Design a protein with these regions (language model features):
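Peptidoglycan-targeting cell-wall enzymes and recognition modules
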Residues: 2-21, 49-158
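Solvent-exposed, polar/charged alpha-helical surfaces in well-ordered, non-transmembrane soluble domains
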Residues: 6, 24, 28, 45, ...
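N-terminal carbohydrate-binding/catalytic regions of secreted carbohydrate-active enzymes
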Residues: 11-42
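Secretory-pathway/luminal and periplasmic proteins that interact with or process carbohydrate-rich
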Residues: 17, 33, 50-60, 166, ...
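Surface-exposed patches in mature extracellular/periplasmic domains of secreted proteins
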Residues: 32-44, 57-61, 166-178
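Acidic helix/loop microenvironments that form the catalytic cleft of cell-wall polysaccharide enzymes
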Residues: 48-51, 124, 169-187
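GST-like fold's C-terminal all-alpha helical module
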Residues: 152-170
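Low-complexity, Gly/Ser/Thr/Pro-rich intrinsically disordered linker/tail segments
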Residues: 180-205
């Protein structure tokens, strides 16, 4: 099923001009990756709307305050360390994403190089590499390709289908979808609110 720019605007709160820039890219991705029922579409739009701040941010925001670091990564920073790292996105990424998801040590720079990008925030070397193989894109060498609307949308659809999120949408398991995307329940209230926006937009309410 295809959506209109007006439905996309109402589903994500992105504004009419932004919806016009995105609608064909998102429709193309949803068609390619079988996001093709009202509930699949609603859940997809709710999740990517949250992750991309209403389709307006395609790179992860890591500009955390000390307080934000302690709240988001309480086991990775002491209070003293949080103050030392605050408002330094590159240092933060290289620390919190080091030695996992296929990334190297903090000194490798992989954490920042493979920080979240695209509509669903693909994160980590291994996820970029998997997407690269699936989509035939040089994402390991050029991760910034996911900052382009076409690939941001395609990669989000690929991630959604490859992680079994269409099946979870069919089962109504929205919170489980959040866990698959976020590895936690960050922003659960906003995601839930966006799901209602999307359902209303698709229903024509």
């Amino acid at each position: 099923m295809k959506i209109t720019a007006d439905q996309l605007d109402r589903a994500t709160g992105c504004g009419a001009s932004t919806a016009g820039l995105w609608v064909e890219h998102i429709n193309g991705s949803m068609a390619r990756f079988e996001i093709n029922t009202p509930e699949r579409v609603a859940m997809f739009l709710a999740q990517v709307g949250h992750e991309s701040q209403s389709l307006k941010r395609l790179v992860e925001n890591l500009n955390y305050s000390a307080e934000g670091l302690l709240k988001t990564w309480p086991t990775r920073f002491t209070a003293v360390e949080a103050k030392q790292y605050a408002r330094q996105p590159e240092r933060i990424a290289n620390r919190v994403y080091a030695n996992r998801m296929g990334n190297g040590s903090p000194d490798s720079g992989d954490g920042y190089r493979y920080r979240g990008r695209g509509l669903i925030m693909i994160t980590g070397h291994d996820n970029y590499a998997e997407a690269a193989r699936a989509l035939a894109l040089p994402l390991v060498a050029q991760p910034e390709l996911l900052e382009q609307r076409t690939w941001a949308a395609i990669a989000a659809g690929w991630f959604w289908q490859s992680r079994g999120l269409n099946d979870l949408a069919d089962q109504g398991r929205f919170e489980r979808i959040t866990l698959k995307i976020n590895s936690g329940y960050n922003g659960a209230d906003d995601r839930a609110a966006r799901l209602e926006w999307a359902r209303a937009a698709l229903a024509g309410a």
